[in-house]
Amino acid sequence: MSKSTVFTVLLLLLGMAAYSFGWVQAVAEAAAQYVQIFNNDALRLGLLACIAAVLMLPAFLYLHYVTQSVKNMTAAFQKLTQSHQSCCDFQHHRLCSRYAEEVKSLRDRYKNVRQTYVMAAVLCQVIIFGCMFEIVKAVPFRLHTPPIVSTGMALLLILYLLFYMRMYLLKLFQHGTLFKKILACVLTGAGIGWMLSFTISELLFLIILAAIQQIGSFIYKRFSNRGFTSLDL
């Protein structure tokens, strides 16, 4: 069993224990008391969404860095392979010594991209989101809408999430094992059923948080692309 797997299992067990013993709910209720200082529901939701976005920012930035690094590493590896077409026989695995050195140098350049770090960043986001969502549930909001409105908003949010994950889902159903496909279908169905039970305040919190993260993602991509363009020049 790899270190990342052990780390993931331990964190999941810790999270399940904290939730089952009521520690998460107790902390959420205590935090909700401070949020209730503000009398405006829109201000409460905006404040909670901003706090969640700020707490998730380090993991958010690292995951964007990993995504960009993987793209750059793939492009650099393809360029490296093309430059050694004349001296290496890739079909029969006859490679020159310079190619091996350059591949090692390329790997060292992107050594910060590790599966353990990625898993830790994802779990960090999940834990922070779960805690903030519990705080939203603990705050007594005065927002009331007809069921059709909340159901419609939930469906729009579900469609957005499915569109956001479309590349991963397509890759999974094209190349994944049968077990992974069944697991993905079960988890997707459970997630859709769970989201349809959300209140209007919970849905608005998710929408505001998603909007903040989309804006942050857009800004990050603009600045990172400018940085890479200036490096290329």
Curated annotation (Swiss-Prot):
The chain crosses the membrane at residues 4-24, 46-66, 116-136, 145-165, 192-212. Signal peptide: none annotated. Keywords: Antibiotic biosynthesis, Bacteriocin biosynthesis, Cell membrane, Membrane, Transmembrane, Transmembrane helix. It is found in: Cell membrane. GO terms for biological process: bacteriocin biosynthetic process. It comes from the Bacteria. The keyword Repeat does not apply. This is Antilisterial bacteriocin subtilosin biosynthesis protein AlbG. The lineage of its organism: Bacteria, Bacillati, Bacillota, Bacilli, Bacillales.
